Amino acid sequence: MDHAEQTKSAEFQKAEAYIFKRLKKELSPTLSYHGYHHTEDVMNAAMQIAEAEKISESDKELLRIAVAFHDAGFIYIYQDHEERGCRMVEETLPSFGFSAAQIQLICGMIRATKIPQRPISHLEQIIADADLDYLGRDDVFPIAETLFKELKIYANLHDEEAWNKLQLNFLSSHHYHTATAKKLRTTGKEEYIGKLK
């Protein structure tokens, strides 16, 4: 890695550290699902998928920044938090040396996590799959419970039967996008659907 690449990588790390610090400090404790822990979880899943999908190191760095910011908009608003997160990216990342083209790619990835997901690029597919990685994992029930708890506050959803119906409707229309997520998570997701019925 040459000096210019090292400097760029250091700036990426500073930007990531900056937003993680804000997420830890400023996300509401009532965000039982979309808390700091969710961003950490998505980061782990995104890096696992990116590795398996053979993504370049420079694209992984952009992906890491997109993951770090993907739910940062929750600091300010609940609905349309993705757009608020993109605004934060546009306001913040130029000071860390990010180009307009990089910012555009990062915002594309953030927008790809909006439900219903409509990712276009490979990186957008990776972040979309990472954001919902838990749906096909063994820990899906406790994680889903944190989302139900959050929606009781933010979406006035209180009835467990309505919650299960909402989940089934969502799960029936959801699909993973990358070959890696399809391979790793589809069977687990189908088992989860079976248990909800």
Label every model-predicted segment.
Residues 59, 91-92, 152:
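Juxtamembrane helix-loop transition sites at the ends of transmembrane segments
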Residues 2-3, 27-56, 69, 98, ...:
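Divalent metal-dependent phosphate-bond-processing catalytic cores, especially two-metal-ion Mg2+/Mn2+ enzymes
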Residues 92-100:
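Inter-helical turn/loop segments and adjacent helix faces that build the functional surface
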Residues 42, 60-76, 81, 85, ...:
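His-Asp-centered metal-binding catalytic motifs of divalent-metal-dependent phosphohydrolases/nucleases
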Residues 32, 75, 79, 96:
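Short gly/ser-rich anion-binding loops that grip negatively charged ligand groups
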Residues 6-25, 38:
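Short alpha-helical hairpin
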